[in-house]
Amino acid sequence: MERGVFQFVFRYSKAQQLVLILVVIASLPFYFFSLDIPKQIVDKAIRGSDFPTNYYGLDLEQVPFLMVLCAIFLILVVVNGGFKFFLNVYRGAAGERLLRRLRYQLIERVLRFPRPQFRKTSQGEVVSMVTLETEPLGGFFGDALNLPSYQGGLLLTLMGFMFVQDWKLGLAAIALYPVQGWLIPKLQRQVNALGKERVKSVRRLNERIGEAVTGAHEVHANDTSQYELADYSTRLGKIFDIRYQIYKKKFFIKFVNNFLALLPPFFFYSIGGWLVIVGDMTVGSLIAVLGAYKDVSAPWKMLLGYYQRKEDARIKYEQLIEKFELNDLLEEEKLVAEPDDKPAMTGQLVAANTSLSEDDGLKVVDGASMRVDLPSHFAVVGPPGGGKGEFSQMIARLLNPSGGKISLNDTDLSGLPEAFTGRQISYAGQTPYIFGGTIRDNLLYGLKHRPLREIEYEGSAASARERQISEADVTGNVSHDINANWVDVNAAGADSEDDLVGRMQHYLKIVGLEDDVYSIGLRQNIEPSERPELVENLLAARKKMRERLDEGKVSDYVESFDADKFNSNASVAENILFGTPVG
């Protein structure tokens, strides 16, 4: 990943940033003309006396001349508004695309983390960094070059306009800017340092809260709740102190900005008024300068705010890179590669003098070797904590050996992509993870490697899918359709979807979960809009069952539920409720 935030912006949005700068340059002449029109309206159309006047080849009386100037002013307002609308929308889209790319890169890196890294980084910390801490970066990405070029262009245009009207007033307008340019960044660096410390403190608090949630039983079992609360109180107090210092410095910066911004109008009214009195300046020019300076404060404040945001974004980005830039990441090629030549899971599996060390240097596995002819059954035995579980995970390529190597037919397993190890080698640990979704999704999770059969979209759905692919390509995301059929039925030894269902039932029966899953299914509600075919089949089966009961002349022995009849096989309460209370 790029080490700096501007490197990231330049690499992935150079063309978009160039378009924004060109549009900014094109908009500035129109903005300058919009500043000059009010002066012409006051001095020439309202206070003027030489009529009719020639205006670009047209002889106009006073009122028509006034209306023409007002119409031009209105047109310029619309044009300037159009430029601003385009810039806002375009930079917003550019920023969101960069934010999407950054989040995707971070999520991809999480998938490439070595497993020991998850013992150092809590789940909450990773989630917070990928979602919350990247959010402010999205707004800055779009403004990285657009805001300083646009607001800086407006500021220079306004300054140039004021100097054209009178150089003394122009000089008075910018006299205090060097002071602000020196003082504000100096104060802002102090705020940035505090902000960096605040982020670290909040992360440590998140980690401690995660520990309390995971180890809540230990807290209650040992009566250490007051100790834990004291720790949280101390951490919250530290965060409060940091934030309080940030507030004081930020509002002091705001106070200085406001004070220095209100001094130039004093010079305008005093010096400008004197120039009007002695006849060296027109009233229209003074009004135009006052109006221009009123607009100057906005881009100047935006530029000062941009400096603060730039420093915040730089700190956030560098902290993210620091957390996600690891030396022992799984190579990206191994994560996505689809090799043409896939070695068979036969032959010899050899572990040669393998070892596995913890971060503190403690060896969990030391000098383990084996040679097994595949296919075969074998067991790794040893005392609790003796490393047999870690050795099994090294065979499954879930952990990388610190020393030695594990090979299949002289091919180092660590050099093979996950497309091989993830499909040819399975690992079932003591604490499997259940993903959100259905039981079927979890049972078939190991068969979803690549999309096998795409969905044929039509109409608006096809257009939406094309746009989804286009945006994914632009932002460096994978463009696979999550709604496609990902299940590789052949990998499960099945010939079709129906055959796959039978195999699922077979394996559930082997592990003793068939009745449990069946019972769970009976207790579920079916959403008709999501499973219309299943609902239709169930209603047809109910009707068919009723017909068979009647044909077999056993309907007297089976009493079906009917809302209009009393059911003699149910209690009075169940008849009144037409059901059984839950809970």
Language model features with spans:
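Transmembrane helices of ABC transporter permease
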Residues: 17-27, 146-197, 270-281
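Membrane-integrated ABC transporters
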Residues: 1-34, 45-73, 79, 83, ...
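An intracellular "coupling" helix at the cytosolic face of ABC transporter transmembrane type-1 domains
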Residues: 7-14, 115-116, 132-141, 145, ...
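Cytosolic ends of transmembrane helices, especially the final helix of ABC transmembrane type-1 domains
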Residues: 221-224, 248, 295-325
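Primarily ABC-family ATPase nucleotide-binding module
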Residues: 324-376
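Hydrophobic alpha-helical segments in the permease module
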Residues: 73-80, 177-184, 250-264, 270, ...
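Helix-to-loop junction immediately C-terminal to a conserved catalytic motif
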Residues: 395-396
